[in-house]
Amino acid sequence: MDNKKIRNFAIIAHIDHGKSTLADRILEFTNTVSKRDLKEQHLDSMDLEKERGITIKLNAVQIRYNSYIFHLIDTPGHVDFTYEVSRSLAATEGALLLVDASQGIQAQTLANVYLALENNLEIIPIINKIDLPSANVDKVKAEIENTIGISAENAILISAKNGIGIEKVLEAIVNLIPPPQASDEKDPLKALVFDSYFDIYRGVIIFIRVVTGKISVGDTFKFMANNLKFSVIELGISSPNQVKKEALFAGEVGWVAASIRNAKDVEVGDTITLVENPAKSPLPGYKKLVPVMYTGFYPVDSQQYNLLKDSLEKISLSDSSIIYEPESSKALGFGFRIGFLGLLHMEILQERLEREFNLSIIATAPSVEFQITRTNGQVQIISNPSLFPEPNFISEIREPYILAKIFLPEEFLGQIMGLCQDKRGIYVDLEYIDDFRRRLIYKLPLVEVIFDFFDRLKSLSKGYASFEYEVIDYQVSKLQKLDILLNGQKIDALSMIVHKDFAYPKARDLTQKLKEIIPRHSFEVPVQAVIGSKVIARETIKAYRKDVTAKLYGGDVTRRKKLLEKQKAGKKRMKSFGVVDVPQEAFLAILKTNVSEK
């Protein structure tokens, strides 16, 4: 196959800027998928992706256009899924930068463009939704030039929804994106693993981009990170359905089935090479994924623990970023502590478990990894608040900080700066992008961002602000563990880590919420928030009482007193042994205590 006829590219866009729609139009225009078979968001395979209008898993598809072969790698646009983007960009030579004509450049678009520039990709600016009344093409062109520093003079103007300008996009791919580097078939094989999924009949299917050499059916290859060896049983391309081939050559993107039974054997971003003629070094530039937040997942029905375990195993086959380990809680029984890339990532996993495996899940409040130095000098890394040592054994606590870059219209600057201050933010910089838009840079504690920062940012800015972040370092903070006691019993799953300055308002808010949520019992239930052994907030859930005197009529008053005393003694005994029923909403209440920490 002639290398000069291949073009590998990805589409970079913020959520809702029309990326999946553009991919649909390209598939339709090139007859890769017939109009009859084309579904909206064709490359988004999960129902969840279509419902939320977002791309979660990346997809690779081969497209024929005239005498050329394109490999389009569809990428996610949300900040939580940056790892998916970085992994797909490394498999391409060019990127289509898709910008909404009415909204302009957003934070996540910029983050992904920088990833593309780091990979030395050719970037083609495309302005979408030009048919909208609010479209401002000249302003967006100026933004692209000022913010990113690439020429937007020849930016392609399209409407993906109405199919306007699609042919110009295809011609630009041919003329502007360079072909893959030429390579001799006899060169050692180097192929980048950029995705994988699990097939119940064929095991783990890996998606690869062949950089040098070739790979054929029957070849034995090894992963360079762990040296595990496998033989190729089938390989081929996606068009967008799988088509089998005998070999994949340099520049091609395709899939390989090799009876890989354990998903943990496949590390996305690894390099594969042939055992007989191995490459000396792997391809550069891949990082191991590190979760930024941790949450406990527990089945509502404790008998579904094994089903939850199997379900997590199956999902982790296609989502290599999920890290989990078993844990137990006195209140909730057996479950798992799971590491995520962000709050959206967590919500999506919970929805997938509930939909695909019919599980009912209780999720505890998300937390981050804290570095705790004990008084004896020992350093511990703890992500579960219930495992924190007692305050008198702690010498210092360090928490992760992020560098947040927030894009926003000038009119919302005051409110967003106020939000960052509420979240213990440290001001770094303010940049003027144009007459109307600003880029605000803050250092923020990660634990403050994972709760409701994104939602509040959107509501304060009427949806116009966007942000991206990176974890930068750990800093010493005045943090304390806040425990909740119900009827004198500590509920470990309700424990949380709070800043000393916000402990009292947060404790008061949480006890009031729990008082409203937890149903009344036959006995009085005190709800206490404690730090160490000190109670800092308390509410009482009043008991409901049975009218034991209802059957009395007339007679001596001592009879009435005797019945009431008997009821009182019974309630006292019940209070000692009674179990408080804690509904799922109580755990969600923790997420909602971040309303404002002023």
Curated annotation (Swiss-Prot):
<dbReference type="Pfam" id="PF03144">
    <property type="entry name" value="GTP_EFTU_D2"/>
</dbReference>
<keyword id="KW-0648">Protein biosynthesis</keyword>
<dbReference type="InterPro" id="IPR035647">
    <property type="entry name" value="EFG_III/V"/>
</dbReference>
<dbReference type="InterPro" id="IPR006297">
    <property type="entry name" value="EF-4"/>
</dbReference>
<keyword id="KW-0472">Membrane</keyword>
<dbReference type="InterPro" id="IPR004161">
    <property type="entry name" value="EFTu-like_2"/>
</dbReference>
<dbReference type="InterPro" id="IPR038363">
    <property type="entry name" value="LepA_C_sf"/>
</dbReference>
<dbReference type="Pfam" id="PF00679">
    <property type="entry name" value="EFG_C"/>
</dbReference>
<dbReference type="InterPro" id="IPR000640">
    <property type="entry name" value="EFG_V-like"/>
</dbReference>
<comment type="function">
    <text>Required for accurate and efficient protein synthesis under certain stress conditions. May act as a fidelity factor of the translation reaction, by catalyzing a one-codon backward translocation of tRNAs on improperly translocated ribosomes. Back-translocation proceeds from a post-translocation (POST) complex to a pre-translocation (PRE) complex, thus giving elongation factor G a second chance to translocate the tRNAs correctly. Binds to ribosomes in a GTP-dependent manner.</text>
</comment>
<dbReference type="InterPro" id="IPR005225">
    <property type="entry name" value="Small_GTP-bd"/>
</dbReference>
<comment type="similarity">
    <text>Belongs to the TRAFAC class translation factor GTPase superfamily. Classic translation factor GTPase family. LepA subfamily.</text>
</comment>
<dbReference type="InterPro" id="IPR027417">
    <property type="entry name" value="P-loop_NTPase"/>
</dbReference>
<keyword id="KW-0342">GTP-binding</keyword>
<feature type="binding site">
    <location>
        <begin position="16"/>
        <end position="21"/>
    </location>
    <ligand>
        <name>GTP</name>
    </ligand>
</feature>
<keyword id="KW-0547">Nucleotide-binding</keyword>
<dbReference type="GO" id="GO:0003746">
    <property type="term" value="F:translation elongation factor activity"/>
</dbReference>
<dbReference type="GO" id="GO:0005886">
    <property type="term" value="C:plasma membrane"/>
</dbReference>
<keyword id="KW-1003">Cell membrane</keyword>
<feature type="domain" description="tr-type G">
    <location>
        <begin position="4"/>
        <end position="181"/>
    </location>
</feature>
<protein>
    <recommendedName>
        <fullName>Elongation factor 4</fullName>
        <ecNumber>3.6.5.n1</ecNumber>
    </recommendedName>
</protein>
<dbReference type="InterPro" id="IPR009000">
    <property type="entry name" value="Transl_B-barrel_sf"/>
</dbReference>
<dbReference type="Pfam" id="PF06421">
    <property type="entry name" value="LepA_C"/>
</dbReference>
<dbReference type="InterPro" id="IPR000795">
    <property type="entry name" value="T_Tr_GTP-bd_dom"/>
</dbReference>
<feature type="binding site">
    <location>
        <begin position="128"/>
        <end position="131"/>
    </location>
    <ligand>
        <name>GTP</name>
    </ligand>
</feature>
<dbReference type="InterPro" id="IPR035654">
    <property type="entry name" value="LepA_IV"/>
</dbReference>
<keyword id="KW-0378">Hydrolase</keyword>
<dbReference type="GO" id="GO:0045727">
    <property type="term" value="P:positive regulation of translation"/>
</dbReference>
<dbReference type="GO" id="GO:0043022">
    <property type="term" value="F:ribosome binding"/>
</dbReference>
<dbReference type="InterPro" id="IPR031157">
    <property type="entry name" value="G_TR_CS"/>
</dbReference>
<dbReference type="GO" id="GO:0003924">
    <property type="term" value="F:GTPase activity"/>
</dbReference>
<dbReference type="GO" id="GO:0005525">
    <property type="term" value="F:GTP binding"/>
</dbReference>
<dbReference type="Pfam" id="PF00009">
    <property type="entry name" value="GTP_EFTU"/>
</dbReference>
<dbReference type="InterPro" id="IPR013842">
    <property type="entry name" value="LepA_CTD"/>
</dbReference>
